[in-house]
Amino acid sequence: MNKRDYMNTSVQEPPLDYSFRSIHVIQDLVNEEPRTGLRPLKRSKSGKSLTQSLWLNNNVLNDLRDFNQVASQLLEHPENLAWIDLSFNDLTSIDPVLTTFFNLSVLYLHGNSIQHLGEVNKLAVLPRLRSLTLHGNPMEEEKGYRQYVLCTLPHITTFDFSGVTKADRTTAEVWKRMNIKPKKARIKQNTL
């Protein structure tokens, strides 16, 4: 199967599902059997999964150390990951490793322990990100939570399982003008 055919078929493939496995560290995935659904996972000749979805929700992960290496061991084309579900874990930050998956369009991070709203800035480099969840994290309590996320990630169409409307975008822009100070341009002084 060539890469183009893979891209066309793997979107409909079932996810590689490690949810509800009490996984503490990413490396444990290598020795863990994924959950099975109604449709079996397709595998490459090398035995790796042919899917673009990885579900790690409802575990006890507190970091994503070695995520890239493990994804490469489990998936035939980890660079094509389009959906990662890390909801209901113990993550305290958005790990920069997630920003290396440029095809990521769905990212679930709800129900974790992410404190700081500024963590969202890391996701701005993901050009295809369209659906994001962050509710149930301490950051949700920060003033302007929804507006900040929509300003930082203007290309998302669904946030916390709610569609992003034109009114949401307008409100976010007004909020941005009122709350985010523009960076001042530095003026170089002539040192003659």
UniProtKB/Swiss-Prot annotation:
Q: Which PROSITE patterns match?
A: LRR
State whether keyword Repeat applies: yes
Per UniProt, residues of the LRRCT domain are 137-175
Q: Name one Pfam family in it.
A: LRR_9
Cellular location(s): Cytoplasm
Chain positions of LRR repeats:
49-71, 80-101, 103-124
For this UniProt record, the keywords arranged alphabetically read as follows: Cytoplasm, Leucine-rich repeat, Repeat
One cellular component (GO) term of this entry = axoneme
Q: Which PANTHER family match?
A: LEUCINE-RICH REPEAT-CONTAINING PROTEIN 51
> What more is known?
LRRC51 and TOMT were originally considered as alternative reading frames, LRTOMT1 and LRTOMT2 of the same LRTOMT gene in primates.
| Protein's name according to its UniProt entry | Leucine-rich repeat-containing protein 51
Q: Say which species the protein is native to.
A: Macaca mulatta
